[in-house]
């Protein structure tokens, strides 16, 4: 789970794969927002002024694509994309909300393992359920949110 920390994403907690082999990110790690699905998911559900500050820091030639990515994430309610840092890893990322809005993002670095039963779609569904449960614990109310689609299945 990651949160914004200025222009970075701070990894607050990391869980090891339940399988014998896997990929994980170190708790406490900092990554530039633009290099992470967590950063983009948090930004996609952040207030417009936060998004505009982020877009203003991007090179002008990248702004339209960055803006379109944020819009896609808002429409889908999640991001499912190849990792920009690790080949072969598929980032599955979902927002976590509190009473004020987006608070964090949960990301699974999905790697399809031979003979492993879970698919990316099943993993994403599980992450969405977990994000909704965590959001409710933080005071989020699905019924009153403009981002209902982000966490509803």
Give the residues covered by each predicted segment:
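Short, solvent-exposed recognition segments
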Residues: 15-87
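Bulky hydrophobic/aromatic content
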Residues: 5-11, 148
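Sensor-regulatory modules in signal-transduction proteins
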Residues: 96-99
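Short hydrophobic alpha-helical segments used for membrane anchoring or interfacial signaling
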Residues: 1-6, 15
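Residue-level signal for well-ordered, solvent-exposed loop/turn and beta-edge residues enriched
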Residues: 8, 101-102
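Juxtadomain coupling helices with adjacent low-complexity linkers
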Residues: 65-71, 76, 87, 103-153
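Short hydrophobic/aromatic beta-strand element in the GNAT-like acyltransferase core
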Residues: 11, 81, 93
């Amino acid at each position: 789970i990651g949160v914004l920390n200025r222009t970075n994403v701070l990894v607050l907690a990391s869980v090891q794969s339940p399988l014998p082999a896997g990929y994980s990110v170190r708790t406490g790690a900092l990554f530039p927002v633009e290099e992470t699905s967590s950063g983009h998911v948090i930004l996609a559900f952040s207030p417009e002024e936060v998004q505009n500050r982020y877009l203003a820091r991007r090179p002008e030639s990248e702004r339209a694509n960055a803006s379109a990515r944020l819009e896609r994430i808002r429409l889908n309610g999640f991001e499912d994309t190849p990792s920009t840092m690790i080949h072969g890893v598929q980032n599955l990322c979902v927002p976590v909300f509190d009473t004020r809005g987006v608070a964090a993002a949960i990301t699974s670095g999905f790697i399809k393992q031979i003979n492993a039963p879970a698919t990316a779609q099943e993993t994403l569904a599980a992450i969405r359920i977990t994000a909704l449960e965590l959001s409710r614990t933080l005071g989020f109310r699905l019924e009153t949110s403009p981002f209902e689609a982000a966490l509803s299945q």
